């Protein structure tokens, strides 16, 4: 972890861990139609986290599938552009994981 972020993480680790747990509790299984609302809820969670981080132009963009979450912060002219790309959905649990083998 870069030294510049370490004091922030140390000072906020309980809150950050609780926020991560809240996010992980959302069953955002994108391949399961019964979790469509949960995927939407996960997108809204991510959008709010971006707002809380002071990103700007936060948008939930509708698509033919699941929503896309976008934000930017364009206040560093002359500095390199950074693109962060990821997904906020999860895969269904593997029924074999966590089962006792007989």
Q: Which functions belong to the PLM regions below?
A:
Residues 2-99:
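Acidic/His- and Gly-rich active-site-bordering loop/insert found
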């Amino acid at each position: 972890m870069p030294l510049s972020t370490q004091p922030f993480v140390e000072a906020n680790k309980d809150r950050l861990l609780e926020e991560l747990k809240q996010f992980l509790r959302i069953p955002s299984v994108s391949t399961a139609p019964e979790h469509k609302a949960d995927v939407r809820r996960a997108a809204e969670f991510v959008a709010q986290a971006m707002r809380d981080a002071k990103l700007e132009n936060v948008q939930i963009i509708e698509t033919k599938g699941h929503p896309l979450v976008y934000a930017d912060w364009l206040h560093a002219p002359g500095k390199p552009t950074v693109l962060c790309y990821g997904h906020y959905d999860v895969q269904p649990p593997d029924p074999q994981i966590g089962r006792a083998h007989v």
